[in-house]
Design a protein with these regions (language model features):
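Hydrophobic structural segments
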Residues: 2-288
Length: 288
């Protein structure tokens, strides 16, 4: 069939005369508050009384990236900003006190310098401690065990079975794998044989020790209450029980768990920059 000149012109002009296609609506930017809501939904019921929450900054801002750390020290805040992360998620307090209330620090030069940097860098600080540490199974315990290459365990009591070793060899293994510089203290004889270890990151109180030490040779503790836990372990030994305590420091004991937290957050926001910022052992001694 022969195409007339008129038909040809009409066919050529048709795309120009058609109504314009509407562009798809732009996707709203993910804000800090959006991600916090996702995390809260993923961990389940939110406690009425908790230390967790926004400690500084505006959560309504667009999220550029997340830095996860066990301690939001000024050094790590600078690293977060340099990495393009405007949300810092921390296990420990931002402003030193348990509830981040400045109290008598409100006019302190150190507090003011930190607050000024947060404001200047437009960072948002969110504490995520209570709800992360009470997940079951405890992700902090699992992360320490993974760092130490312990596979056998735990039960609900956080006790791991390990290849038999001496207490001094266990100390060396823990020190090397967790990067301790000087924060380890031990109760018990170096040659004591060890087969089972109770892993207790963070604060180790007397109730936990009494309830669980029966099934373990050693407590691997973060920050034991020295006036409670140490006398109990010493008296257990004096009573004939072969028990020991290794204290590695709170920060060292919590850090592997926050690296695991960063990996978990990546699953909630695929494609989002999520950095795990190490803190490492803040202590040193003459032998390190």
């Amino acid at each position: 069939m022969r195409l007339t000149r008129r038909a040809f012109v009409q066919a050529a002009a048709a795309p120009l005369l058609a109504p314009p296609q509407q562009a798809p609506p732009a996707q709203a930017a993910l804000t800090v508050a959006h991600l916090v809501d996702r995390i809260r939904a993923a961990v389940g019921p939110w406690r009425e009384k908790t230390v967790d929450g926004i400690k500084a900054g505006d959560p309504s801002v667009a999220l550029t990236g997340v830095a996860v750390t066990v301690a939001a020290r000024l050094e790590n805040l600078r690293r977060a900003a340099s990495a393009g992360c405007n949300l810092v998620i921390t296990q420990e307090p931002v402003f030193y006190g348990a509830n981040d209330d400045p109290g008598n620090r409100a006019s302190d030069a150190v507090y003011l310098a930190k607050k000024a940097y947060i404001d200047q860098a437009k960072l948002v600080l969110w504490r995520f401690s209570d709800h992360w540490s009470t997940r079951q199974p405890d992700p902090r315990v699992a992360a320490i065990a993974e760092a130490l290459s312990w596979q056998d365990g735990p039960g609900s009591d956080n006790i791991y079975r390990i290849p038999e070793t001496s207490l001094s060899s266990l100390m060396a293994h823990v020190s090397t794998r967790l990067g301790l510089r000087g924060g380890m203290r031990t109760v018990g004889p170096p040659g004591m044989r060890v087969r089972t270890v109770l892993v207790s990151p963070g604060t180790t109180d007397l109730a936990t020790t009494v309830a669980r030490l029966k099934g373990a040779d050693v407590v691997l503790a973060g920050e034991p209450r020295e006036w409670e836990v140490v006398p109990y372990v010493l008296d257990a030994r004096e009573s004939g029980a072969a028990k020991a305590l290794i204290s590695i420091g709170r920060i060292v004991s919590e850090e592997p768990g926050m690296h695991a937290c960063a990996a978990w957050i990546r699953t909630l926001a695929p494609g989002l920059r999520v950095e795990a910022l190490p803190v490492s052992d803040p202590f040193w001694n003459a032998a390190s």
